[in-house]
UniProtKB/Swiss-Prot annotation:
The gene coding this protein: pyrG
Pfam families in alphabetical order: CTP_synth_N, GATase
Record's keyword terms, sorted: ATP-binding, Glutamine amidotransferase, Ligase, Magnesium, Metal-binding, Nucleotide-binding, Pyrimidine biosynthesis
Positions that bind L-glutamine: G356, L384, G385, M386, Q387, E407, R473
Protein name listed in UniProt: CTP synthase
Reactions the enzyme catalyzes: UTP + L-glutamine + ATP + H2O = CTP + L-glutamate + ADP + phosphate + 2 H(+); L-glutamine + H2O = L-glutamate + NH4(+); UTP + NH4(+) + ATP = CTP + ADP + phosphate + 2 H(+)
HAMAP family: PyrG
InterPro entries per UniProt: Class_I_gatase-like (IPR029062), CTP_synthase (IPR004468), CTP_synthase_N (IPR017456), GATASE (IPR017926), GATase1_CTP_Synthase (IPR033828), P-loop_NTPase (IPR027417)
Source species of the chain: Cupriavidus pinatubonensis (strain JMP 134 / LMG 1197)
């Protein structure tokens, strides 16, 4: 029988509810429990797929092809369970489902209201999401409720959580509330009043937290914890101090040392084995004691908001942990490269162009790719980064000076990258799209197995097959592949059904390490295992650094 831990937030957003939930889940998993996580987003969008990265950050793609909140990426990095579409849902999905039921007459003529119809639907989604993991036998499901207590958008979700707790009875539900304890420099002290008011607001809804996670820029002294305990009406040992850490992988140990997992297990009447966090300690030690150091230039248009590349940044850090390397990331605005300024690329040990959409900044990215190719700097292109590498090669090596993508120029003489109009999805179903199709939910999404060409860099990295996740509408145009191959490019992986290029590379005679992938490998990297492609990329950067030194 699955038990539930609801994780809520107060005072301000962006306190790290996702990291807190994932860290607690990691501790519970280390105690031998089967754990899953869900994220409830209060916005009315059906999913974040069409939301601006500047507003929402990264869109994380699950194995089954769902476009979800970036917190699901944290969940997969901290626990062994794979997230699915059912692990993330929004107000938009809830209302869409209820309205469909009303149109079908399932409510038998009743007036459809927020309570009970919307809140019942939320509960059904939560229980269905929890049942989708571990063959329906998860011991604990942690449910992160997006937004901040007091926001009107979050109220139906909080009410649904309260109703679930009442319906399931004691010891089936626990509540963890994350709040802010700011340090006021002019007063020289931490202020607990925002936390007091946040808990008061939560209790007005009918929810009393089992534990409080108090975020601050420093450890919270015992006297302040005692004060919070008094006003929040919870024991002092349930007031957990969560201070700023230089690595998110230190958080599980921080929470465990203060007994959060013990409190939750006692509340839920669970008696698992003691926590074993030795793996997390080993990862932190590897991160803090590197033997090498490199700098990678990430060339993109969302570089002012690194949340847009959250999984990619973490994947590079994981590769650093597994190669004893400190990976520094230099964020380079691609638009600045369009007018020159290529000198910023000279100190870099490697260059990376991540995924993205739209024409803005693409010519700057192409200039960075040309620099990497001509100066033998290790290069990794992901999704759009592979497409632009093909365009750059077509223009400057294969003689197609007008080469472009139809995403950026419909009139290009050489559309070496074009819209996918038909492909077979991971379940064998034929999908068809056109330029007039809706933007939402119409991309090639999810994991797909693809054979790899023998004797290539791709084969040395992945072996005979690659299984990675996709999120894109455009593909390398097969019509131009023979011309590109005649000029020296190697297409090292193709989809088995449509023969679409999945990986490209340059041979060793042209470049020491130049690889492009149409998929998103960052979505499957974990701190436990790293990722073979990113490890190979970091090793190539180290080799290039040695060549420069020599």
């Amino acid at each position: 029988m699955t038990k539930f831990v609801f994780v809520t937030g107060g005072v301000v957003s962006s306190l790290g509810k996702g990291i807190a939930a994932a860290s607690l889940a990691a501790i519970l998993e280390s105690r031998g429990l089967k754990v899953t996580l869900l994220k409830l987003d209060p916005y009315i969008n059906v999913d974040p797929g069409t939301m601006s990265p500047f507003q929402h950050g990264e869109v994380f793609v699950t194995e089954d092809g769902a476009e979800t909140d970036l917190d699901l990426g944290h969940y997969e990095r901290f626990v062994s369970a794979k997230m699915r579409k059912s692990n993330n849902f929004t107000t938009g999905q809830i209302y869409e489902s209820v309205i469909r039921k009303e149109r079908r007459g399932e409510y038998l003529g009743k007036t459809v209201q927020v309570i009970p119809h919307i809140t019942n639907e939320i509960q059904a989604f939560i229980e269905r999401g929890a049942a989708a993991s571990h063959d329906g036998k998860a011991d604990v499901a942690l449910v992160e409720i997006g937004g901040t207590v007091g926001d009107i958008e979050s109220l139906p979700f909080l009410e649904a959580a309260r109703q679930m707790s009442l319906r399931m009875g004691r010891n089936r539900c626990a509540f963890v509330h994350l709040t802010l304890v700011p340090f006021i420099a002019s007063a020289g002290e931490l202020k607990t009043k925002p936390t007091q008011h946040s808990v008061q607001k939560l209790r007005e809804i009918g929810i009393s937290p089992t534990a409080l996670l108090c975020r601050a820029d420093r450890p919270i002294p015992d006297d302040e914890r005692a004060k919070i305990s008094l006003f929040a009406n919870i024991p002092q040992d349930a007031v957990i101090s969560v201070w700023d850490a230089d690595s998110i992988y230190k958080i599980p140990q921080m929470l465990n040392e203060q007994g959060l997992d013990r409190l939750i297990c006692e509340e839920l009447r669970l008696d698992p084995k003691p926590a074993d966090l030795s793996m997390w300690q080993k990862l932190v030690n590897a991160q803090e004691n590197p033997e090498h150091e490199i700098t990678i230039g990430m060339v993109g248009k969302y570089v002012d908001l690194t949340e847009s590349y959250k999984s990619l940044i973490e994947a590079l850090r994981h590769a650093g942990m597994h190669t004893a390397t400190r990976v520094n990331i230099e964020y380079i605005d691609s638009e600045e490269l369009e007018s020159g300024h290529l000198e910023v690329l000279a100190p870099l040990d490697a260059i990376l162009v991540p995924g993205g959409f739209g024409k803005r900044g693409t010519e700057g990215k192409i200039r960075a790719i040309q620099y990497a190719r001509e100066n033998k700097v290790p290069y990794l292109g992901i999704c759009l980064g592979m497409q632009l590498a093909v365009i750059e090669f077509a223009r400057h090596v294969a003689g197609m000076t007008d080469a472009n993508s139809t995403e950026f120029n419909l009139e290009t003489e050489h559309p070496v990258v074009a819209l996918i109009t038909e492909w077979v999805d991971r379940e064998g179903k034929v999908e068809q799209r056109s330029a007039e199709s809706d933007l939402g939910g119409t991309m090639r999404l999810g994991a797909q197995r693809v054979p790899v060409k023998e004797g290539t860099k791709a084969a040395s990295i992945y072996g005979a097959e690659v299984n990675e996740r996709h999120r894109h509408r455009y593909e390398v145009n097969n019509h131009y592949v023979p011309t590109l191959e005649n000029a020296g490019m190697v297409i090292s992986a193709r989809t088995p059904t449509e023969n679409l290029p999945e990986m490209m590379e340059l041979p060793g005679s042209m470049h020491p390490w130049f690889v492009g992938v149409q998929f998103h490998p960052e979505f499957t990297s974990t701190p436990r295992d790293g990722h073979p492609l990113f490890k190979a990329y970091v090793e190539a950067a180290l080799a290039g650094q040695q060549r420069k030194g020599a």
